[in-house]
Amino acid sequence: MLKLRQLQQQKQQQLAKNAGSSVKANTNSTSPAKLRLQKDIEELELPPTVRVNIISLDNHKEMSLNIIIIPDEGFYKGGKFRFTATFLETYPIDPPKVICNNKIFHPNIDPHGKICLNILREDWSPALDLQCIVLGLLSLFQEPNGNDPLNKEAAEVLNKDKLEFGNLVRLAMSGAMVGSTYYECVI
């Protein structure tokens, strides 16, 4: 897998070649949101448990990234969880839309992929960046929060019996039914 900086440099070279102009001239016509996201990507320092792949930075209305979290500790250790982050032209004024692409048994992620992470809602600030988003997603797996749930069933078990919660997480991660919901294998 190419490193993000190499991928970005290749993309800039390709854009410059296609436009018949320098990278610097091409950057001047780029939207503020795209420039900010490119800066965020350049400055990104990923822990070994996280990967980020660029889906598209060329779309004029939105830019998308895949974020893969592979926790190395806690209840979700060994799982591979995929997220899509979509950045609109209003980024960084507005937060990106982030969804989980896997159906997982987690108190802060509902079965449809909606995520309960304050920095993606009311605590968002333009000072936050892609690094903060990645660390926020990683924290969901290190410290799931049963007091602010989207998945009430998972939150109830977490708050009541952490050992049982761990057993149900393992069962769900292996691709099984928990309660009335089937969770896909992410191990």
Swiss-Prot record:
Belongs to the ubiquitin-conjugating enzyme family. UBC12 subfamily. Accepts the ubiquitin-like protein NEDD8/RUB1 from the UBA3-ULA1 E1 complex and catalyzes its covalent attachment to other proteins. GO terms for molecular function: ATP binding; NEDD8 conjugating enzyme activity. Its EC number is 2.3.2.34. Residues 19-32 have a biased composition (Polar residues). Residues 11-34 are annotated as: Disordered. The active site is at C116. PANTHER family: UBIQUITIN-CONJUGATING ENZYME E2. Pfam families: UQ_con. Keywords: ATP-binding, Nucleotide-binding, Transferase, Ubl conjugation pathway. The keyword Glycoprotein does not apply. The keyword Transferase applies. Residues 32-178 form the UBC core domain. PROSITE patterns: UBC_1, UBC_2. Pathway: Protein modification; protein neddylation. This is NEDD8-conjugating enzyme UBC12. GO terms for biological process: protein neddylation. It catalyses: [E1 NEDD8-activating enzyme]-S-[NEDD8 protein]-yl-L-cysteine + [E2 NEDD8-conjugating enzyme]-L-cysteine = [E1 NEDD8-activating enzyme]-L-cysteine + [E2 NEDD8-conjugating enzyme]-S-[NEDD8-protein]-yl-L-cysteine.
